[in-house]
């Protein structure tokens, strides 16, 4: 890998509380976040259990918002946030012109009314405040080895059935290429500062490799609201799991950024 999408520092903090497949993707986003200038107060959209924010942010004031009350309780317990808001980002009322930074970590693609969500974010930012939005590439699932194998053996129609099924499983309401995401932002009150591809094909291949065993964590979350039950044991196993994850990234050996986009947008400054 030409860039450290997966480091032990991030992995060892994430792995005790999340399945391997999720760790790989989240750690790659963490590395991308470390290249950004993030100033508080911060709004974390789709904050989940708060683990990402606890590792990523050092600001004194971080607010989290999530539509899921169970996730909100875990977020509160994480002590990563000064405030937790339970509600739909497309409908909730937030303090106007309050946040200097907003981060949406692969959450907006799950919001049916994405324009309403972007309007809420814009109104909550100070003029000139920035939002960093991680969103999926329309064709991210086409890089799954199983999808590529089906395509080579049986053609595009058969492969697309599995590819579409993957996106349905992850409840993606919005999947666009770069031009599509540009159009989404153009229709919103926000201004596009930059858009760049992030997360390599290798992370998708590694994600797929660990997806089936990680489904046990998904089932556990449905039953208990948490990904893992024994964080202490997983912490001890983190070095071994990290070697396996890094090995899969090396086997995939594809640095092309095909999985997601990082949209850098800002609330326009008011004319003087």
Name what the model sees in each region.
Residues 1-97, 101-104, 118, 246, ...:
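Conserved N-terminal segment of class I S-adenosyl-L-methionine
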Residues 41, 128-130:
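Short glycine-centered segments of the SAM/dcSAM-binding site in methyltransferase folds
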Residues 106-110:
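Short catalytic micro-motifs in class I SAM-dependent methyltransferases
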Residues 112-120, 130-264:
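S-adenosyl-L-methionine-dependent methyltransferase catalytic module, highlighting the catalytic core
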Residues 129, 271-272:
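Short, charged, solvent-exposed linker or helix-capping segments at domain edges/interfaces
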């Amino acid at each position: 890998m030409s860039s450290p999408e997966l480091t032990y520092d991030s992995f060892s903090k994430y792995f005790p509380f999340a399945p391997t497949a999720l760790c790989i993707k989240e750690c790659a986003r963490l590395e991308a976040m470390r290249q950004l200038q993030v100033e508080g107060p911060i709004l974390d959209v789709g904050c989940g259990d708060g683990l990402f924010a606890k590792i990523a942010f050092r600001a004194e004031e971080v607010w989290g918002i999530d539509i899921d009350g169970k996730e909100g309780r875990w977020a509160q317990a994480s002590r990563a946030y000064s405030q937790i808001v339970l509600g739909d980002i497309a409908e909730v009322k937030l303090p106007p012109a309050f946040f200097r930074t907003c981060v949406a970590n692969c959450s907006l693609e799950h919001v049916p009314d994405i324009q309403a969500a972007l309007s809420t974010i814009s109104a909550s930012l100070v003029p000139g405040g920035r939002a960093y939005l991680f969103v999926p590439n329309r064709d991210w699932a086409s890089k799954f080895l199983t999808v590529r194998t089906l395509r080579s053996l049986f053609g595009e129609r058969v492969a697309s059935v599995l590819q579409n099924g993957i996106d349905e499983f992850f409840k993606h309401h919005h999947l666009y290429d770069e031009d599509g995401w540009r159009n989404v932002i153009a229709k919103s009150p926000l201004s596009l500062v930059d858009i760049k591809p992030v997360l390599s094909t290798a992370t998708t291949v590694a994600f797929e490799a660990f997806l089936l065993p990680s489904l046990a964590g998904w089932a556990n979350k449905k039953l208990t609201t948490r990904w893992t039950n024994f964080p202490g044991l997983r912490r001890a196993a983190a070095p071994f799991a990290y070697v396996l994850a890094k090995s899969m990234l090396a086997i995939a050996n594809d640095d092309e950024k095909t999985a997601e986009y990082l949209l850098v947008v800002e609330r326009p400054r008011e004319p003087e």
